[in-house]
Every structure is written in structure tokens, then in C-alpha cells.
């Protein structure tokens, strides 16, 4: 294959600007898939992606195209647009030479557009803008061109103006890919094999399937390969490409993107970002992998049926293989038994993982309230990291507590600036700056505690801006904060799964809200149940669930009043004994309903 005619590129954009639709049109126009097999969101293979209309997983496909009597091979990598899946984007960019930047002609440059551009620049990629949805009545092409030129600094004089939905000017995109996307640099089939794993998944028949970009060398069936991070060796059983179905080939060569299997049954042997080389003729040093991403949000996942715990462990091992950003460890709870504590990149990431476990592995789950990673400095000089409120030390042992802050960039039309500023202040945000995108749109920058935006901030932002604002955030470090742990007590017993950490400014409101909700969610028992919220030994909120009353006088038809008094006293004593030894039954759905109501 002529290396000069290979083009490796990905498509990046803000969520809902038309990446997957453009991918569909490129697949269609190059006749990679027959018209009969063609469907919308072809590369979004997960049912969940189709339902939500978003891309969650990156996906690679090979397209063949002929222009001016030359045969071209395109490797297109479709990427997610949501801020939670930035890690997926960075992985796909490492396997490319260029990125098509799709911008919606009705919305212009959004917060996540800029974030993805910076990722592409970090990877030294050629950025090629494409303006989509030009057929819509509200499209303002000239304004969007100016935005791209001023905010990103790319000349837009010959930018393709397309409609991915109708197929308008899609052939211009193919021309610009041939003209502007560089062919693979220094790709040599005769050098030692050097291939980057940018994605993987587990197949029950083939074992681990690795998606790779070959930078140097050749890879064929029967080769002995070495995974450089773990120093483990395997014999290649199959290599091939996706177009978009898996298609096996005799070999893959430098510059190509494809897949490799080697009957790998040990899931832990494969790491996304690792380098594969030939075991008998290895390369000098591995490729620069990916920077390890840090989890932003932590939450406990527990099976509704404790018998499903082993199945949950298997499910977590397989999902981690396809989602390198997910972290987890096993934990136990007094109230819920065995489960896993997971670290996620954001709330959407958390929601997607939970839904995947329920759908793909048929394990109904209880999701506990999300938390962030706090730092505790103790009086004895120790430093502790706490992502689970139940593990927070006693208050008298804590010298100071730090919480993570994020830099929040909100892109919005002018008329919503006031409501957004008020919203950010209510969530403990600190105003930093206001910059202009154009005459009618601004970018507001705030520094805000991460714990404040992981609950309902995004929904409230959409509400006050009628859905017109977009946001992007990045972690900027830890700051000293006045935080306390709130324990929830039922009948005097702490329920570890309900503990939470709050800033002292909001602790009374939050405690009161949860206690009132629990009163409505927990069914009445034969004895009175006090529900208390406590900070240390101080009770800051209380509600009581009244006892169910059995009418012990029903069988007394008249008769002596002392007989009735005796029966009532016996009932009173029985209830005292029940209260002392009886346990409160918390329905499983209470935990998820508490979380839903918070949102």
C-alpha cells in the first residue's frame, strides 16, 4: 500500500453538532456499506448511544476512496462530544494525523469545541474546520466563520459548508481530507513493530480484542508480540480492519489502523495506551502513552440482590477493558452488604456505566449519592484522601480539610448572564472573568467547588438559560474549606450508606431535606422510628415516623376499665422492647429515590 495515500483522522466537535451524522455520510459516499445496510448513527454500536443520540465510545472504521485515478485509504475515528468523555477523544487523537473540527452553523463555537481543539493541538494535529447544518433557517455562516478565525485562529476562506443530514457538499469534505490531512509520518514497514493500543474490548470467543494504530513495522498472524507495559508475550491469532464490521486480513502495515487478537484471556494484561512490539525484534522504547486521567466523581454501586455480587465483579473487569477511565475497588456497607466504589469522569459517565451494567449484564443496581475526593490533614500530621463519607475520620482528629475546585467556562447568549451569575453564586462560585465570543454571546468563567456541580447544577443551568448555554470544566486544584460530615441515624443506629459531606454554609438545609425525604420513603413499623441527622454528637435535624397502632381493645366489649389499662400497658412495654431490639427495614429503592429527588 502506498503510504502517501493513507489518511488517519478523527472528527471532533461539541455534543450534538453532527459528528456521527457526518461519519454516516462519509461511509455512505465512499460506499463502505451498502445502502441496504446503512442506518443512522452507524458507528454508535451501543443501544444506549442510539437511544440517547450521543457517542459514548470512540469507534474506528476504514474507508476506501478513489479520486483522480488514485486509491486512498481513510481511517476515520468517531469520537464523543460530551465533556465527560474527553478521555475517549484524547485516545483517538493519539492515533491520528489530523482532526476534522465540526461546528454547528446555528450555534457556533461552544465551550467543548474549544476544549477539543486544545486536545488536538496538544497532539500536534492538523485542524480542519467544517461548518455543518448550513441548510437550517437559523444558520449564520459568516458569524461562525468569524468565531472560528478569532477564537481558534484558523483561516476559514475555503472551509467546507455542509449539511451532514442532507449530504450537501460532502464531496468537498473528501477533497479537503485528501488535500490537508498529512499522510503517516516516517511510517516504515521494515522497522521493528511499534503499535499503539487505543481501545479494547472482551470477546467471549476471541479473548481481548485490541484496536491499534501501527506506527512502524508489520503485524501478521503467527507473530509473537510483546505488550511493553506488562512485559507479557502472546501469539497473534487474527489481524484485520473495521469497515465497519470486523474483516480479517493477512497482515497490517505501518500507517494503518486495525485490530489484533491473540487469545488473551487475562484481561489485566492489556492496557489502553500500551505499545505492542515484536517479541523477537522489539523496538527501542514504547510510544508515549496517555496521561492517566483522574476520576472526578465517586459513587458506590451495590447489587439489589446480594447473590449478584460475583456477577458484578466479572462485569466490572470486562467494562474496565472497554473504558480505561473507570476506576473501582470493592467495599462493604453495613446497610447494603458487598459492592464496588467507582471513580467516574463525571455524572454522565456514571450514569452510562450504571446503565451498561444493568443492560449488558442484567444486574439491577443501587447507586449511592456521588461524592468527590477530599483531602484531610489530621492533627497527628497524616494526610488522608477521602472519597467515601463513611470513611471520614472523627471531627476532633481533623486539622483541616481541602476540596477540589474546577474552572468553569460557560458559553451563553447575552440575555442569560444575570441568571447564570446568580446561579453560580448560589453554588459557592467565585467570579473570574467575562469574555466576548461575538456581539451577542459571552463566556463566563467561574472557579467553583466540584462537589457543588455534581448534583443539580447542570440541570439548573439548562433551566435558567432555556438550554442555550454550554459548559466546560477543568480541575484546578484543592482549596481549604469548612466541611463537616453528616451522619444519618435511624432508631439511633448510623446508616453508613446515607452519610454525606457538606459545607457548613448549607449543612442545615441539606440535613433537613434528607431527613424529611426519609420520613416519606421509609414505611411505618410497629414501633416509633426517630430519623436524625448528626454532626459529631450534635443532632441538627430530626423527624419521627409514628408507630403503627394495633387496637388491643378490640376484643374487650365493655368490662372493667382496669382490664383495658392492663392491655394498653402490656402493648406499651412490648413496643419499648421492640424499639430496643428491632431493626429498621430500609427498602432498596429508598437510596435511588433519595438521589433522584436531589437532582
Swiss-Prot record:
PROSITE patterns: G_TR_1, G_TR_2. InterPro entries: EF-4, EFG_III/V, EFG_V-like, EFTu-like_2, G_TR_CS, LepA_C_sf, LepA_CTD, LepA_IV. It is a peripheral membrane protein. Pfam families: EFG_C, GTP_EFTU, GTP_EFTU_D2, LepA_C. It catalyses: GTP + H2O = GDP + phosphate + H(+). It is found in: Cell membrane. One of its GO terms (cellular component) is plasma membrane. Its EC number is 3.6.5.n1. Residues 4-185 form the tr-type G domain. It is an enzyme of class 3 (hydrolase). One of its GO terms (biological process) is positive regulation of translation. Keywords: Cell membrane, GTP-binding, Hydrolase, Membrane, Nucleotide-binding, Protein biosynthesis. Belongs to the TRAFAC class translation factor GTPase superfamily. Classic translation factor GTPase family. LepA subfamily. HAMAP family: LepA. Required for accurate and efficient protein synthesis under certain stress conditions. May act as a fidelity factor of the translation reaction, by catalyzing a one-codon backward translocation of tRNAs on improperly translocated ribosomes. Back-translocation proceeds from a post-translocation (POST) complex to a pre-translocation (PRE) complex, thus giving elongation factor G a second chance to translocate the tRNAs correctly. Binds to ribosomes in a GTP-dependent manner. PANTHER family: TRANSLATION FACTOR GUF1 HOMOLOG, CHLOROPLASTIC, TRANSLATION FACTOR GUF1-RELATED. This is Elongation factor 4. It comes from Mycoplasmoides gallisepticum (strain R(low / passage 15 / clone 2)) (Mycoplasma gallisepticum). The gene is lepA.
Amino acid at each position: 500500500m502506498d503510504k502517501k495515500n493513507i489518511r488517519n483522522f478523527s472528527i471532533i466537535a461539541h455534543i450534538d453538532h453532527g459528528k456521527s451524522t457526518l461519519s454516516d455520510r462519509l461511509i455512505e459516499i465512499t460506499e463502505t456499506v451498502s445502502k441496504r445496510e446503512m442506518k443512522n448513527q452507524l458507528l454508535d454500536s451501543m443501544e444506549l448511544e442510539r437511544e440517547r443520540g450521543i457517542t459514548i465510545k470512540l469507534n474506528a472504521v476504514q474507508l476506501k476512496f478513489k479520486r483522480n485515478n488514485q486509491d486512498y485509504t481513510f481511517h476515520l475515528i468517531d469520537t464523543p462530544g460530551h465533556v465527560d468523555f474527553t478521555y475517549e477523544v484524547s485516545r483517538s487523537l493519539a492515533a491520528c494525523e489530523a482532526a476534522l473540527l465540526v461546528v454547528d452553523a446555528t450555534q457556533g463555537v461552544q465551550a467543548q469545541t474549544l476544549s477539543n481543539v486544545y486536545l488536538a493541538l496538544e497532539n500536534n494535529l492538523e485542524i480542519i474546520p467544517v461548518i455543518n447544518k448550513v441548510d437550517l433557517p437559523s444558520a449564520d455562516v459568516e458569524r461562525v466563520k468569524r468565531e472560528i478565525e478569532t477564537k481558534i485562529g484558523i483561516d476559514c476562506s475555503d472551509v467546507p459548508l455542509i449539511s451532514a443530514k442532507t449530504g450537501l457538499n460532502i464531496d468537498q469534505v473528501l477533497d479537503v481530507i485528501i488535500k490537508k490531512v498529512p499522510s503517516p509520518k516516517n511510517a516504515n514497514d521494515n522497522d521493528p513493530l511499534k503499535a499503539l493500543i487505543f481501545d479494547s474490548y472482551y470477546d467471549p470467543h476471541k479473548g481481548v480484542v485490541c484496536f491499534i494504530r501501527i506506527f512502524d513495522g508489520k503485524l501478521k498472524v503467527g507473530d509473537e508480540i510483546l505488550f511493553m507495559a506488562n512485559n507479557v508475550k502472546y501469539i497473534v491469532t487474527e489481524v484485520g480492519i473495521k469497515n465497519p464490521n470486523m474483516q480479517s486480513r493477512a497482515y497490517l502495515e505501518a500507517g494503518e489502523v486495525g485490530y489484533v487478537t491473540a487469545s488473551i484471556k487475562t484481561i489485566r494484561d492489556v492496557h489502553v495506551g500500551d505499545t505492542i512490539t515484536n517479541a523477537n525484534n522489539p523496538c527501542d522504547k514504547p510510544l508515549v502513552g496517555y496521561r492517566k486521567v483522574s476520576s472526578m466523581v465517586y459513587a458506590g454501586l451495590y447489587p439489589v440482590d446480594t447473590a449478584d455480587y460475583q456477577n458484578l465483579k466479572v462485569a466490572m473487569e470486562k467494562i474496565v477493558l472497554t473504558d480505561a477511565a473507570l476506576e473501582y475497588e470493592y467495599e462493604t456497607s453495613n446497610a447494603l452488604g458487598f459492592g464496588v466504589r467507582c471513580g467516574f469522569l463525571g455524572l454522565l459517565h456514571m450514569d452510562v456505566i450504571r446503565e451498561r451494567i444493568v443492560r449488558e449484564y442484567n444486574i439491577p443496581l443501587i447507586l449511592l449519592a456521588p461524592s468527590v475526593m477530599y483531602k484531610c490533614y489530621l492533627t497527628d500530621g497524616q494526610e488522608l484522601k477521602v472519597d467515601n463519607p463513611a470513611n471520614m475520620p472523627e471531627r476532633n482528629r481533623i486539622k483541616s480539610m481541602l476540596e477540589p475546585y474546577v474552572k468553569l467556562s460557560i458559553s451563553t447568549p447575552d440575555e442569560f448572564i444575570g441568571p447564570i451569575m446568580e446561579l453560580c453564586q448560589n453554588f459557592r462560585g467565585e467570579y473570574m472573568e467575562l469574555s466576548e465570543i461575538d456581539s451577542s454571546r459571552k463566556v463566563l468563567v467561574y472557579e467553583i467547588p466540584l462537589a457543588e456541580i455534581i448534583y443539580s447544577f447542570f440541570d439548573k443551568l439548562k433551566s435558567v438559560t432555556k438550554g442555550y448555554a454550554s459548559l466546560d470544566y477543568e480541575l484546578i486544584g484543592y482549596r481549604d474549606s469548612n466541611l463537616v460530615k453528616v451522619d444519618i441515624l435511624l432508631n439511633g443506629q448510623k446508616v453508613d450508606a446515607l452519610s454525606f459531606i457538606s459545607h457548613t454554609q448549607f449543612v442545615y438545609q441539606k440535613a433537613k431535606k434528607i431527613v424529611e425525604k426519609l420520613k416519606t420513603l421509609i414505611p411505618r413499623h410497629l414501633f416509633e422510628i426517630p430519623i436524625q441527622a448528626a454532626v459529631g454528637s450534635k443532632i441538627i435535624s430530626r423527624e419521627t415516623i409514628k408507630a403503627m397502632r394495633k387496637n388491643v381493645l378490640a376484643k374487650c366489649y365493655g368490662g372493667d376499665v382496669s382490664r383495658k389499662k392492663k392491655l394498653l400497658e402490656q402493648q406499651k412495654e412490648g413496643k419499648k422492647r421492640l424499639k430496643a431490639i428491632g431493626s429498621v427495614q430500609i427498602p432498596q429503592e429508598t437510596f435511588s429515590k433519595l438521589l433522584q429527588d436531589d437532582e
